[in-house]
């Protein structure tokens, strides 16, 4: 019996690396730890003599001990120690990047975040070439595309976190309006992670009823507007971006991959094959419903959209094509 217990404890656990220990990164690490999904490696910069990744990892490790969660948590100051600890990662989550500052153009912001991203993708190629990457940094759709280009990974192994969060926000606003259990509400948001996201009301339900049968057109318009402005509302109230719900969205994706759950969820993915024909979109990463399992994106869910929803999705894709063209230009300058 004792030998079996020891063998169980020593069994190899999934390794999940999180690059960036800001609010989103640290909360991803926290949730991964509390759920015991695998060993957690937290990477961050060495700042003015301080090592936040090491400090936060130590705190999380002590929490895990307190709660009898048998995983390892380690912090790495990557500009001091490098990225060698990425070796053996099953999943790498990229949360690091800079927010848009006053006076920065869209091109300036993208260029700066591409430079940061390239440092990470070079390290992932060297040390974690078999991993699945989840991109959280913004602009997430464009940086997911750039990650595929920079790593040369199969597109199914590079996934952007967007639609899971946007769908949760849509669900929250529906719940606030009707006041029933979360479990009985299903919502779907596709497209870009931004003002051109597409809340898909034809595939959003309260119980067995489409929300279009529950709410009036004006009420639905209000719900859509609230969903599109959900992130901006938090910024206006707090002065910084959300982090609890984004972190939870990442961890839901990680859990489906690690445990091969094959859950269907909207993610920013590179559109190809049958999905490209169905949605009439190609050459970009955009939020679509996919099956997430141990291989990453295992399949596309081909949703039949209304005429209006299809037009809105194509409008979203057109904007992303412009960003992709800009990204290709800037990548050549790196």
UniProtKB/Swiss-Prot annotation:
Name the record gives this protein: Malate dehydrogenase 2
Alphabetical list of PANTHER family matching this protein: L-2-HYDROXYCARBOXYLATE DEHYDROGENASE (NAD(P)(+)) (PTHR43128), L-LACTATE DEHYDROGENASE (PTHR43128:SF16)
Annotated active site: 193
A Pfam family hit: Ldh_1_C
Cellular component terms per the entry's GO annotation: cytoplasm
The family this protein is said to belong to: Belongs to the LDH/MDH superfamily.
EC number of the protein: 1.1.1.37
Molecular function as annotated in GO: L-malate dehydrogenase (NAD+) activity
Binding-site residues, substrate: 100, 106, 138, 169
Residues involved in NAD(+) binding: 19-25, 113, 136-138
CDD domains reported for this sequence: LDH-like_MDH
GO biological process: carboxylic acid metabolic process; tricarboxylic acid cycle
InterPro entries: L-lactate/malate_DH (IPR001557), Lactate/malate_DH_C (IPR022383), Lactate/malate_DH_N (IPR001236), Lactate_DH/Glyco_Ohase_4_C (IPR015955), Malate_DH_type3 (IPR011275), NAD(P)-bd_dom_sf (IPR036291)
Keywords for this protein: NAD, Oxidoreductase, Tricarboxylic acid cycle
Record function comment: Catalyzes the reversible oxidation of malate to oxaloacetate.
Catalytic activity from the UniProt record: (S)-malate + NAD(+) = oxaloacetate + NADH + H(+)
């Amino acid at each position: 019996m004792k030998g079996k217990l020891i063998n169980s404890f020593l069994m190899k656990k999934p390794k999940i690396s999180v690059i960036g220990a800001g609010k989103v990164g640290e909360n991803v690490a926290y949730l991964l730890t509390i759920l015991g999904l695998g060993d957690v490696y937290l990477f961050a910069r060495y700042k003015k003599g301080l090592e936040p990744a090491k400090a936060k990892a130590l705190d999380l490790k002590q929490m895990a001990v307190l709660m009898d969660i048998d995983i390892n948590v380690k912090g790495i100051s990557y500009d001091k120690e490098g990225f060698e600890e990425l070796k053996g990662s099953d999943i790498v989550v990229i949360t690091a990047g800079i927010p848009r500052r006053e006076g920065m153009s869209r091109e300036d912001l993208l260029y700066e975040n591409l430079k940061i991203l390239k440092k990470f993708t070079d390290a992932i190629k060297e040390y974690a070439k078999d991993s699945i990457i989840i991109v959280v940094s913004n602009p997430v759709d464009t940086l997911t595309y750039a990650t595929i280009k920079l790593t040369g990974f199969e597109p199914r192994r590079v996934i952007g976190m967007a639609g899971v969060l946007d769908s949760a926000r849509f669900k929250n606003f529906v719940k606030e309006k009707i006041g029933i259990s979360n479990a009985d509400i299903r919502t779907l948001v596709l497209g870009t992670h931004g003002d051109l996201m597409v809340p898909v009301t034809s595939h959003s339900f309260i119980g067995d009823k489409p929300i279009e049968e529950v709410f009036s057109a004006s009420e639905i318009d209000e719900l859509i507007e609230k969903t599109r402005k959900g992130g901006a509302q938090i910024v206006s109230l707090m002065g910084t971006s959300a982090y609890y719900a984004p972190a939870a969205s990442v961890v839901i994706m990680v859990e489906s991959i690690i445990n091969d759950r094959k859950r269907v969820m909207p993610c920013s993915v590179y559109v190809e094959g049958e999905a490209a024909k169905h949605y009439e979109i190609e050459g970009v990463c955009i939020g679509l419903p996919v099956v997430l399992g141990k291989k990453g994106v295992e399949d596309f869910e081909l949703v039949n959209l209304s005429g209006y929803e299809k037009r809105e999705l194509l409008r979203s894709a057109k904007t992303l094509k412009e960003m992709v063209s800009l990204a290709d230009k800037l990548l050549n300058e790196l």
